[in-house]
């Protein structure tokens, strides 16, 4: 890939992404969302740089993301900013204060476990994709219930109406995305 502005790098990487169907659900395959096909370093760097440039870092105590595909973004943003990070895991560790959260995507359901987040901590939540909002919504509710401050929520790729729905139902949640896509005639289209 050639050097260009970060948003163009991310959007160009989305064009031509393969599409598979999981039942009635069209699923795009992209390295930010799936770890395959291989990710060019420029795509991760561009995505990281977009996130880093959007945040008032004086207002963030901790960066949080969900296993598994949020991890590359979490690590890259944490390293770039020097802020500590916590992973919301898909298995229990049985630690004191652990919070169990049931989540669902457009094609599956699972359980996540939140550890090591204290009341009053100002969080940046980063994630790879929002589609239905079925993962993000219960996680944000649980984090709020733990007393954490949802200072900022940035998702790399928006597909579907999940962010719009959550923004209408929970306008106090600061959910932003880097690039919005749709799948039209079996292909990824960039909306913004």
Identify the residue ranges that each predicted region occupies.
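Active-site-facing substrate-recognition patch
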Residues: 1-59
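PRPP-dependent phosphoribosyltransferase catalytic core
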Residues: 4-6, 140-192
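Short, glycine/charge-rich flexible loops or terminal/linker lids adjacent to PRPP-binding catalytic cores
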Residues: 80-123
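Conserved G/P- and acidic residue-centered "switch" motifs that form tight phosphate/ATP-binding loops
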Residues: 128, 133
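Conserved acidic residues
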Residues: 61, 121, 151
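Short Gly/Thr/Asp-enriched flexible loops that form oxyanion-binding sites at enzyme active sites
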Residues: 72-81
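Solvent-exposed alpha-helices and their adjacent loops that cap or buttress functional pockets
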Residues: 57, 114-118, 146, 167-169
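Short glycine-rich phosphate-binding loop at a beta-alpha junction
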Residues: 60-67
């Amino acid at each position: 890939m050639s050097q260009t502005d970060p948003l163009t790098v991310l959007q160009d990487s989305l064009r031509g992404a393969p599409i598979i169907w999981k039942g009635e659900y069209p699923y795009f395959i992209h390295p930010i969302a799936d770890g395959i096909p291989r990710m060019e370093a420029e795509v991760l760097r561009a995505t990281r740089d977009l996130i880093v440039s959007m945040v008032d870092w004086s207002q963030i105590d901790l960066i949080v993301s969900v296993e598994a595909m949020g991890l590359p973004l979490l690590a890259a943003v944490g390293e770039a900013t020097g802020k500590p990070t916590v992973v919301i895991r898909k298995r229990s560790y049985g630690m004191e204060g652990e919070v169990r959260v049931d989540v669902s995507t457009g094609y599956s359901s699972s359980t996540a476990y939140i550890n090591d987040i204290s009341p009053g901590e100002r969080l940046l939540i980063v994630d790879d994709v929002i589609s239905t909002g079925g993962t993000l919504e219960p996680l944000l509710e649980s984090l709020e219930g733990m007393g954490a401050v949802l200072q900022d929520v940035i998702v790399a790729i928006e597909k579907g109406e999940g962010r719009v729905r959550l923004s209408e139902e929970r306008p106090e949640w600061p959910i932003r995305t880097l690039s919005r896509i749709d799948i039209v005639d079996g292909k990824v289209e960039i909306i913004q």
